[in-house]
């Protein structure tokens, strides 16, 4: 639908019978009103043409071929001449055949029918509004019992009988036996009410503002009651309060959306456009039909039978009429939700029919498969793997995916740089994977962000922008810090990649959707790019090292290491003074270089020369040992620190006892802080 602000939107909810009729009815130029489907037929078995007033009628839903009526006459669509725009013989309009994708029909039901989604789905909206048990309402809907009409002025058969009960379940089988169809209708219209008509009457009599006021008063009264000793009674009161809250919210929703409660009971049943429930001819002349067509036929058959009972057969017992109304109700229930009342309806091959609910809901439903998750151009999909060397705003695209996504841009680059004379030559170079193709692809990707999306997209961080780079393999590489926003992990999850084409989309991706600009949760404001899972384990391994102090390492042989930096077996170890000391390094580059040359391990303790830091110098920790040298200098040895002083007690240098893992982590943090300050200074 399109609102007054020209915004296209989709609204799902209850509609009035007048709206259903407006969707389906058409007035032909000769004044004839069409739109009602009255026959359960589809195509004629001889001519293979749609049956008139059937489920595929061309008068109701439009022509199968554009501009050609059922008689075979042809008119030019959009011609402004005074030629008639419909065939006077068959009544088919000369319009585009695409009208069969959205033109609806309707079935006029012989009796009211409740919408099973509002009755049987939990919570039951009808039971909530009427404040009645669901089992009691089901008995009314399926004609298991009736209730007396509240007629105060006129004397009725039930009043003379002295029955003031609400339900007359004991008369379910006795009352209809005394009447024929005509007599039973008169009796039912005066004395009792049953079926969906009884529900419709009660819903129509509701005053929603009064329901809200009464529910609020009762909720306050229950809230003022003190807890009792009986736990069961307290739970009962709590459930009643929750029910009243739901009832008030539902009534407010009906008022806010201008929906009448009686619309939950159907008098007109919409018929889907035929293109949404097609019949397809396959090899061998066989036909494949949508299950919806068979369910519609079932409804029409039973509805026509009920019409015949009410109009022609005046000697039919009333019990048979009630039974047929129940069959119509069950047929409509099966159309909306097959199996909601128990055993589902099956075809001759014992296959369950797919109803509206089966077509709409679920991963393979209409919304998730063809509207939300449909395939689009300039998109791809692959498994995600961790890319720990990537920046936060980058992602790795496999070469095969990247060349397909950016193929048009690469073709334009090849032609502009005179590597190809036309599109055909450019495509051949791409198929042959010439080196110049990858160079141009690199240039194209540098200035073009991509969007990564992981279904289901439940919040705005489910789709983010990244700067792509080429990687080997067939998987998309992703920084582990952005996984929490996507609710993704690396156990086989798949993600879709999209290319924003327009300049507006690219600007939006860069300014609003880049991953490094979405570090906080939009819901609560907490950081969402935090280390989890593998990153925490990696940080632990990186910084675990040997946490014992220098004394423990000196006197505890269990933590001593030999010159090859390997663990020593406790049983075979013997302490000797010939073992090498822990190595000294002048800077972090030398320490990391020694690790890469495999001269030390990641958690090997070492001494690293450090700059003069006032926080280290002013430490109040007492030295463990002091070593004096022959030239007058001396070394103050602390738990994780060594200070070299001169004769005048001036600090010459400082050594920190650390590991390669700690050095690597410190360098990463330092580079990140420096990059942040450079970005801030550049921005100012």
Swiss-Prot record:
<protein>
    <recommendedName>
        <fullName>DNA-directed RNA polymerase subunit beta'</fullName>
        <ecNumber>2.7.7.6</ecNumber>
    </recommendedName>
</protein>
<dbReference type="GO" id="GO:0003899">
    <property type="term" value="F:DNA-directed RNA polymerase activity"/>
</dbReference>
<keyword id="KW-0862">Zinc</keyword>
<dbReference type="GO" id="GO:0009507">
    <property type="term" value="C:chloroplast"/>
</dbReference>
<dbReference type="GO" id="GO:0005739">
    <property type="term" value="C:mitochondrion"/>
</dbReference>
<dbReference type="GO" id="GO:0000428">
    <property type="term" value="C:DNA-directed RNA polymerase complex"/>
</dbReference>
<dbReference type="InterPro" id="IPR045867">
    <property type="entry name" value="DNA-dir_RpoC_beta_prime"/>
</dbReference>
<keyword id="KW-0460">Magnesium</keyword>
<dbReference type="InterPro" id="IPR042102">
    <property type="entry name" value="RNA_pol_Rpb1_3_sf"/>
</dbReference>
<dbReference type="Pfam" id="PF00623">
    <property type="entry name" value="RNA_pol_Rpb1_2"/>
</dbReference>
<feature type="binding site">
    <location>
        <position position="69"/>
    </location>
    <ligand>
        <name>Zn(2+)</name>
    </ligand>
</feature>
<dbReference type="GO" id="GO:0003677">
    <property type="term" value="F:DNA binding"/>
</dbReference>
<dbReference type="GO" id="GO:0006351">
    <property type="term" value="P:DNA-templated transcription"/>
</dbReference>
<feature type="binding site">
    <location>
        <position position="87"/>
    </location>
    <ligand>
        <name>Zn(2+)</name>
    </ligand>
</feature>
<comment type="function">
    <text>DNA-dependent RNA polymerase catalyzes the transcription of DNA into RNA using the four ribonucleoside triphosphates as substrates.</text>
</comment>
<keyword id="KW-0150">Chloroplast</keyword>
<keyword id="KW-0240">DNA-directed RNA polymerase</keyword>
<dbReference type="Pfam" id="PF04997">
    <property type="entry name" value="RNA_pol_Rpb1_1"/>
</dbReference>
<keyword id="KW-0808">Transferase</keyword>
<feature type="binding site">
    <location>
        <position position="90"/>
    </location>
    <ligand>
        <name>Zn(2+)</name>
    </ligand>
</feature>
<dbReference type="GO" id="GO:0000287">
    <property type="term" value="F:magnesium ion binding"/>
</dbReference>
<dbReference type="InterPro" id="IPR044893">
    <property type="entry name" value="RNA_pol_Rpb1_clamp_domain"/>
</dbReference>
<dbReference type="GO" id="GO:0008270">
    <property type="term" value="F:zinc ion binding"/>
</dbReference>
<keyword id="KW-0804">Transcription</keyword>
<dbReference type="InterPro" id="IPR000722">
    <property type="entry name" value="RNA_pol_asu"/>
</dbReference>
<keyword id="KW-0934">Plastid</keyword>
<keyword id="KW-0548">Nucleotidyltransferase</keyword>
<comment type="subunit">
    <text>In plastids the minimal PEP RNA polymerase catalytic core is composed of four subunits: alpha, beta, beta', and beta''. When a (nuclear-encoded) sigma factor is associated with the core the holoenzyme is formed, which can initiate transcription.</text>
</comment>
<dbReference type="InterPro" id="IPR034678">
    <property type="entry name" value="RNApol_RpoC1"/>
</dbReference>
<feature type="binding site">
    <location>
        <position position="493"/>
    </location>
    <ligand>
        <name>Mg(2+)</name>
    </ligand>
</feature>
<keyword id="KW-0479">Metal-binding</keyword>
<dbReference type="InterPro" id="IPR006592">
    <property type="entry name" value="RNA_pol_N"/>
</dbReference>
<feature type="binding site">
    <location>
        <position position="491"/>
    </location>
    <ligand>
        <name>Mg(2+)</name>
    </ligand>
</feature>
<feature type="binding site">
    <location>
        <position position="71"/>
    </location>
    <ligand>
        <name>Zn(2+)</name>
    </ligand>
</feature>
<dbReference type="InterPro" id="IPR007080">
    <property type="entry name" value="RNA_pol_Rpb1_1"/>
</dbReference>
<feature type="binding site">
    <location>
        <position position="489"/>
    </location>
    <ligand>
        <name>Mg(2+)</name>
    </ligand>
</feature>
<comment type="similarity">
    <text>Belongs to the RNA polymerase beta' chain family. RpoC1 subfamily.</text>
</comment>
């Amino acid at each position: 639908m399109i609102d007054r602000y020209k915004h296209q939107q989709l609204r799902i909810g209850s509609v009035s019978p007048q709206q259903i009729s407006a969707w389906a009815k058409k007035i032909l130029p000769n004044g004839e009103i069409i739109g009602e489907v009255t026959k359960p037929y589809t195509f004629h078995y001889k001519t293979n043409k749609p049956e008139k007033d059937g489920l595929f009628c061309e008068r109701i839903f439009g022509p199968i071929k554009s501009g050609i009526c059922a008689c075979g006459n042809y008119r030019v669509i959009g011609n402004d001449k005074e030629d008639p725009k419909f065939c006077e013989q068959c009544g088919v309009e000369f319009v585009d055949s695409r009208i069969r994708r959205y033109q609806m029909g309707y079935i006029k039901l012989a009796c009211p029918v409740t919408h099973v989604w509002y009755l049987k789905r939990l919570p039951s909206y009808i039971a909530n509004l009427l404040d009645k048990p669901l089992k009691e309402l089901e008995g009314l809907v399926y004609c298991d019992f009736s209730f007396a009409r509240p007629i105060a002025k006129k004397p009725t058969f039930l009043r003379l009988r002295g029955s003031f009960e609400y339900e007359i379940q004991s008369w379910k089988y006795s009352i209809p036996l005394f009447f024929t169809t005509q007599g039973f209708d008169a009796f039912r219209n005066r004395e009792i009410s049953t079926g969906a008509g009884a529900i419709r009457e009660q819903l129509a009599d509701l005053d929603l503002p009064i329901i809200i006021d009464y529910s609020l008063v009762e909720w306050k009264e229950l809230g003022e009651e003190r807890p009792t000793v009986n736990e069961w009674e307290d739970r009962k009161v709590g459930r009643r309060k929750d029910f009243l809250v739901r009832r008030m919210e539902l009534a407010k929703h009906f008022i806010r959306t201008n929906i009448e409660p009686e619309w939950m009971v159907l008098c007109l049943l919409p018929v889907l456009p035929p293109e949404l429930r097609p019949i397809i001819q396959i090899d061998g002349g066989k036909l494949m039909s949508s299950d919806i067509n068979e369910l519609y036929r079932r409804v029409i058959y039973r509805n026509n039978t009920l019409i015949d009972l009410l109009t022609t057969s005046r000697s039919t017992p009333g019990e048979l009429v009630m039974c047929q109304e129940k069959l119509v109700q069950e047929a409509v229930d099966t159309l909306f939700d097959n199996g909601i009342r128990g055993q589902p309806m099956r075809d001759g091959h014992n296959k369950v029919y797919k109803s509206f609910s089966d077509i709409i809901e679920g991963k393979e439903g209409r919304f998730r498969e063809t509207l939300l998750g449909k395939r689009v151009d300039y998109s791809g999909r692959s498994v995600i793997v961790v890319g720990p060397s990537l920046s936060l705003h980058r992602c790795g695209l496999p070469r095969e995916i990247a060349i397909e996504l950016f193929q048009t841009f690469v073709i334009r680059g090849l032609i502009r740089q005179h590597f190809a004379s036309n599109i055909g030559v450019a495509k051949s170079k791409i198929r042959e994977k010439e080196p110049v193709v990858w160079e141009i692809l690199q240039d194209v990707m540098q200035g073009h962000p991509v969007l990564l999306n992981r279904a289901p997209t439940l919040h705005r961080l489910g789709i983010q922008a990244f700067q792509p780079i080429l990687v080997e393999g067939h998987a998309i590489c992703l920084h582990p810090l952005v996984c929490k926003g996507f609710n993704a992990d690396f156990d086989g999850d798949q993600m879709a990649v999209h290319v924003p084409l327009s300049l507006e989309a690219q600007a939006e991706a860069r300014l609003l959707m880049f991953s490094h600009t979405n570090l906080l949760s939009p819901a609560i404001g907490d950081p969402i790019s935090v280390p989890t899972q593998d990153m925490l384990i990696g940080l632990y391994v990186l910084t675990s090292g040997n946490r014992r102090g220098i004394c423990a390492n000196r006197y505890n042989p269990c933590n001593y290491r030999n010159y090859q930096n390997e663990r020593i077996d406790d049983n075979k170890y013997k302490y000797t003074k010939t073992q090498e000391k822990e190595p000294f390094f002048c800077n972090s580059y030398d320490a990391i270089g020694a690790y890469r040359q495999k001269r030390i391990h990641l958690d090997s303790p070492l001494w690293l020369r450090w700059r003069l830091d006032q926080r280290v110098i002013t430490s109040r920790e007492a030295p463990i040992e002091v070593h004096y040298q022959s030239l007058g200098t001396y070394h103050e040895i602390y738990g994780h620190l060594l200070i070299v002083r001169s004769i005048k007690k001036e600090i010459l240098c400082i050594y920190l006892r650390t590991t390669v893992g700690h050095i690597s982590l410190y360098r990463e943090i330092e580079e990140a802080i420096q990059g942040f300050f450079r970005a801030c200074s550049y921005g100012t």
